[in-house]
C-alpha cells in the first residue's frame, strides 16, 4: 500500500480512534469537571495523532522517526493518565481496558512503522 497522505498511515488511523475514545471518556460528568486531567489526557491523545501527521511532512526519515517517537510517548502518557481516571472512578474498568488497549495497539503500530522506516524505506529527499 502506497502512503500518499498522512491519513493513509495505519498508526494515524489508530491514533485518531484513540483520540475519539479519550474525548468520549472525558465528556462523562465527573471526568469533565477535572479540568487538569481532562486537558492532559486530551492533549496526549491528540498529540499521538498530530505528531504522526506533522512528521509525515518531514524532509527525511530520521526526522519523521523523531515525530513518531513523540507520538509513541504520547500513547504511553495516555495509558498512565487512564490509571488516574480509573483510580478516581471517572471511568469503569471496562472503559479503562478498552482505551488502554487502543493506546497499546496505536503504540505498537507506531513502533512497527518506525522499524519499517529504519530498515526498508529509502531516505526522503528534499523536493
Q: Positions of the model-derived regions?
A:
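Short, C-terminally biased terminal segments at protein or domain edges
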Residues: 1-127
Amino acid at each position: 500500500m502506497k502512503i500518499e497522505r498522512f491519513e493513509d498511515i495505519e498508526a494515524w488511523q489508530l491514533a485518531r480512534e484513540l483520540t475519539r475514545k479519550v474525548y468520549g471518556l472525558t465528556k462523562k460528568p465527573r471526568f469533565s469537571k477535572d479540568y487538569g486531567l481532562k486537558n492532559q489526557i486530551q492533549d496526549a491523545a491528540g498529540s499521538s495523532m498530530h505528531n504522526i501527521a506533522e512528521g509525515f511532512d518531514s524532509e527525511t526519515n530520521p526526522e519523521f522517526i523523531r515525530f513518531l517517537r513523540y507520538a509513541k510517548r504520547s500513547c504511553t502518557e495516555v495509558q498512565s493518565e487512564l490509571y488516574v481516571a480509573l483510580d478516581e472512578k471517572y471511568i469503569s474498568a471496562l472503559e479503562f481496558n478498552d482505551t488502554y488497549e487502543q493506546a497499546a495497539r496505536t503504540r505498537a503500530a507506531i513502533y512497527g512503522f518506525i522499524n519499517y522506516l529504519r530498515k526498508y524505506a529509502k531516505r526522503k529527499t528534499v523536493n
